[in-house]
């Protein structure tokens, strides 16, 4: 099986079109982690059921606003993903406190989805939500999340041009998403049923407060302050509308 990261965007091309400050934020973290790849690989292998060795695929990484992302490929060709929290962009975005809330929210959300639905989601293997001396990778390592990877196919891979459908109503515009091939209709129908089922299952996960999820060491999930700015939690939509948007 080919590495999952083979499908990620080209690193050099992506960096070239970025603002220099943003690109430097990524490149500097890649350089910071480079000497520590063996430690990261050993850490991941220690969680594998058979303790299989793995290698961090260093030349093809990706990123978002908050995390630098690498693939770890094991000797049996299975893959895990490790995400490292990047340094703040300024005094307000991606601060250590904000990053910690984001990580705890994501860990808790995945836990809830796995616990309460049949929706396939990655399994969190290990995480450390803030830089600290107790970080299992080392005291100077950034916050991280280690998780399994899920592979699959897009609807376009199946020959259905779903991008030609209205994202709000599902109404086909100018072209036939099936390309005139009626044998593909069951694929489209199953796709739409699965999307509807996912929305229905997620709608059943409800709490009586508004904020972001937090999870404790026993796996109990509660609602805490919002991940972005640490506001809340709020007891009502009215309170969220008034205070959550910074109004007095």
Feature map (PLM): residue ranges:
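Juxta-kinase regulatory segment immediately upstream of eukaryotic protein kinase catalytic domains
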Residues: 2-59
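ATP-binding pocket architecture of kinase catalytic cores
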Residues: 57-248
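Short intrinsically disordered, low-complexity coil segments enriched in acidic
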Residues: 1-2, 187
